Amino acid sequence: MIFFKKKKKIGLAGWWGGRNEGDRYILKILKRSFGRDFDLDVINIPFRGDPSMIGYLNKLDFLIIGGGGLFTINFPEPFDTYDEWGKSLKTPFGFLGVGVQEVNERLSGTFASIIEKSTFFSVRDTGSYEISKKYSDKADKIFDLTFLSPRKITTSGNDRTMGVNLRVWNFDDRRTYDNSAWCHAINGLKQPKIKIPLSFLHGIDDRKAMEGIASGYSRTFSMGLYKKIGLMLGMRLHSLVFAVQNNIPPIGISYTPKIQRFFDDMNLQEFCLGINDHDKLSSLVERVNNDKKRIGPVLDGYNDHAHRAVARYIDNVVETIKNL
């Protein structure tokens, strides 16, 4: 008689419901990485930390949270109230390739508790690591999870055409982002442009943010759009990540720290613009176009290092969960 060992059931919790192409691809990678060895349940963040949800989580053998941005100025539900329900959670959990923007004083104790209770806690950039390691030596630095399986396509070598991604970011009085000024600066560039939207959620639809740009566009996302470009200007992190994975030089607009951190980790800090630096765009585009021979090897090295690091870490996570 042959006995089959029952697979452990693990939950994959993340930003899966936001119609964001970066998050969608992260989930695809997680399913591919863990689906062979485990049964998977997909869980959308945010979710409530009420007794019924905790009861559901306690039926899992393990809970993976991430990747992607998670700990921003305000933690998403239910991690903002972890101190209230954390002791009721019996299932072991770990954080995989997340971003930590900042930890305000009100949530510092909560954040410390979360890391200490985690089986593992890995972040996607050095800035997130520098914050996290102040709270626990469990913190590990890896890279964005999409580097496990880069979205490589065959580019056409059209160096003159620039891909553009803007996002809605002017819905808060505290934010100084001027969408119209960026559209004006982009329209002033002589080279051809293609709009590349990554997020389609109502209220923060990238297509809305790029209405003021006079260029070709797509109503949907496709990696095929990257075949047509030789330079990428982006706000959304994964618009830039997908360019880097195809050795396309990036220019970032740092609307949150994660964008600047991405460029810092590549040692390409000079190619990331501040949120109000639209007046510097034209000169920076010219600089990138003149510096592509230097940038190419930098991107190659980063891609290789990131892929190896994420692959090694996920292999270790699989073995860790198996052995619990």
Please state what every model-predicted region is.
Residues 1-324:
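Active-site anion-handling motifs in enzyme catalytic cores
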